[in-house]
Amino acid sequence: MKRFFFVAISLFALCASAQQFKQTGTDIDDVKPQGWMHSAVMGDINGDGRIDMVAVCTPNDSTKITKRDDGFCDNFNQPVLVVYVAGADGKQHLFRKYDTILSARVDESIDVTTIPSITKKGNIVLEVSTFASMGSWTTTSTKYVFRYQNSDIYCIGKDCASVARNTGEREVVSENYLTAKQLTTTSNEVKKKKAKKVWKNLPKKALQKLGEFNLENN
């Protein structure tokens, strides 16, 4: 009986270890759990001249993956966001891991994706997009802009865009938390109407850190 429990615990520890991100590695394939889908980008986020890494990785827990009649698989696992910073040793070192802030797919007809990018200035952009294959003509996306400062990552802005595929109506609401300004731009991609822009002041608030709120498409 003791041997059984020892083997069971050892197998559990091995499985748990296989699902962990490595603390250091050379690239995303080296540090992520085997079999996880990923979208990774490289860039200098902390201004030290070294190339860092930001990645969105989706687990492959089979209990949360369904296969449709056409053979396509829907993955309902919650994605994980990881940020690695490059060290003097040339390796990537885990800076932060965020397990619960990204949106997971909840319906077969609604696809939710989070795509990372890094700007030339080193800002991290996380774009959350929603596409409904039925029930809605509107496609929406929200871009969150983050900046590394004071040894952490802070949200400095957000762009919310919506497009009605049937009418061409488009609206983009851009918020800059550094200047406390909001710009709403409305246009029509079909009628090619002149864009209308409306500025608004936002209340001054302390910047939120990455991880302090969920990244949703709103």
Give each language-model segment a name.
Residues I28-M53:
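N-terminal targeting signals for Sec/Tat export/insertion, comprising classic cleavable signal peptides
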Residues I45-C57, T119-T130:
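Acidic/hydrophobic-patterned starts of short beta strands in beta-sheet-rich repeat architectures
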Residues D30-V31, T66-F76, S133-T139:
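Short consensus segments that form the blades of beta-propeller domains
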Residues W36-I45, S109-G122:
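Beta-propeller blade termini
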Residues Q20-F21, T63-Y98, F146-Y148:
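Beta-propeller blade repeat segments, especially FG-GAP/WD-type strand-to-loop junctions
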Residues T113-N218:
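Acidic, small-residue rich beta-repeat scaffolds with periodic aromatic anchors
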Residues M1-F21:
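Bacterial Sec-dependent N-terminal signal peptides
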Residues Q19-P33, A88-E108, P203:
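Blade-edge motifs of beta-propeller repeat domains
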